[in-house]
């Protein structure tokens, strides 16, 4: 049995949360596994060497069908398109207008916006993670291989996201930028452990899910910004969400090709990542004070409906439909069919679990937590 096809239910120890309510909400958002990766049985280089030929055979396809999803730099938006023009005589007035709009946003909104920005700023970790994947990594740092070109150019496009949000935070005057910057530095130094095992089958399942999750989160921060009267910030977050959707399309296409060429291996890889649960990129986030910072951020995101357990289930359901897993038959082993059935039934089970968690959370006493990002002001979690 090939290692890539082994479906493992990896053990995950629960994180001790500050309250019963927090524990339940975090469980609903599936963060217990995310902050407990130290207990995951580590596996490396799980793709059999012969599987690398699958990715070599896809290089022509990647060049013609994947790379066109990247935009030429001259056609891309840049952070300065949305921010006050520092060369303009109206700069101070534009900053004043930005700060006036920001004043109408509640503290809890800034918690999720800062959390999203910090997640984007850890981009060096994500490029590093993709370059751990066997068969698709950038072997020289400037390789012309289409997989390497994709990774570098994807990184360049993503780099604008944290950049624009960070500059907005700085100009808004609403957040403690030193604590935000410390959190970014801690997060990049901590890295991430998504459980992808240097295996591009697992890696591209992960990125397909994660890009959609990020698009959902940015789309919802756009919705909330508009509801609070900041149309410029709403356009900013919406533009970032559009980038994420385009990137999600690309990664989803890769998995489609894997299902075409190696349906059993791809199906087992999808089930493997679903068993492990998708680890959020910033799951090791902390600010030097709050070691449960990611759980607290995730709880606020859940409460504001920015990213919830229901969103997780919706993404699973979307990918099942996109990849046509319910009708996948040809090329599947018995284990592959069991993996397919598990994945296809997962969203419904997760929604039931989320409903139970939400009902229990409503009965718990509300609790406030201080966030260093907003000068230790308290927010309900």
UniProtKB/Swiss-Prot annotation:
Keywords, sorted A to Z: Chloroplast, Fatty acid biosynthesis, Fatty acid metabolism, Iron, Lipid biosynthesis, Lipid metabolism, Metal-binding, Oxidoreductase, Plastid, Transit peptide
GO biological process terms held by the UniProt record: fatty acid biosynthetic process; fatty acid metabolic process
Superkingdom of this protein's organism: Eukaryota
SUPFAM superfamilies (alphabetical): Ferritin-like
GO molecular function terms listed in the Swiss-Prot or TrEMBL record: metal ion binding; stearoyl-[ACP] desaturase activity
Pfam families recorded: FA_desaturase_2
Organelle targeting peptide span: 1-26
UniProt record similarity statement: Belongs to the fatty acid desaturase type 2 family.
Name listed for the protein in its UniProt record: Stearoyl-[acyl-carrier-protein] 9-desaturase 1, chloroplastic
Organism: Oryza sativa subsp. japonica
Lineage of producing organism: Eukaryota, Viridiplantae, Streptophyta, Embryophyta, Tracheophyta
């Amino acid at each position: 049995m090939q290692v890539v096809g082994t479906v493992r239910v990896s053990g995950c120890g629960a994180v001790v949360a500050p309250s019963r309510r927090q524990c339940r909400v975090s469980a609903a958002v599936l963060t217990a596994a995310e902050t407990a990766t130290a207990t995951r049985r580590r596996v490396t280089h799980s793709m059999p060497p012969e599987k690398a030929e699958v990715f070599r055979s896809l290089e022509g396809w990647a060049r013609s069908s994947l790379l066109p999803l990247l935009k030429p730099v001259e056609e891309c938006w840049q952070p300065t398109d949305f921010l006050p023009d520092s060369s303009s005589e109206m700069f101070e007035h534009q900053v004043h207008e930005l700060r006036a709009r920001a004043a109408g946003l509640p503290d809890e909104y800034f918690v999720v916006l800062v959390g999203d920005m910090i997640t984007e700023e850890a981009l060096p970790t994500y490029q590093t993670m993709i370059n751990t994947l066997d068969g698709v990594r950038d072997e020289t740092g400037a390789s012309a291989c289409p997989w390497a070109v994709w990774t570098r150019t994807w990184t360049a496009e993503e780099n604008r996201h944290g950049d624009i949000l960070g500059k907005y935070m700085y100009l808004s005057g609403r957040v403690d930028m030193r604590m935000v910057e410390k959190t970014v530095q801690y997060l990049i130094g901590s890295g991430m452990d998504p459980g992808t095992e240097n295996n591009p089958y697992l890696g591209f399942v992960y990125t397909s899910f994660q890009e959609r999750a990020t698009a959902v989160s940015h789309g919802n921060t756009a919705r909330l910004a508009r509801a609070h009267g900041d149309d410029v910030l709403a356009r900013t977050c919406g533009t970032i969400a559009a980038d994420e959707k385009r990137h999600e399309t690309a990664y989803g296409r890769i998995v489609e090709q894997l299902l075409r060429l190696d349906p059993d291996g791809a199906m087992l890889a999808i089930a493997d990542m679903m068993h492990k649960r998708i680890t959020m990129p910033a799951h090791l986030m902390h600010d030097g004070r709050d070691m449960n910072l990611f759980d607290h951020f995730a709880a606020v995101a859940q409460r504001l409906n920015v990213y919830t357990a229901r969103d997780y289930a919706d993404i699973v359901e979307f990918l099942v439909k996109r990849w046509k897993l319910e009708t996948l038959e040809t090329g599947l082993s018995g284990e592959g069919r069991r993996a397919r059935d598990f994945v296809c039934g997962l969203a419904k089970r997760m929604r039931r679990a989320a409903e139970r968690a939400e009902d229990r959370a409503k009965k718990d006493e509300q609790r406030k937590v201080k966030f260093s990002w907003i000068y230790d002001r308290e927010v309900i979690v």
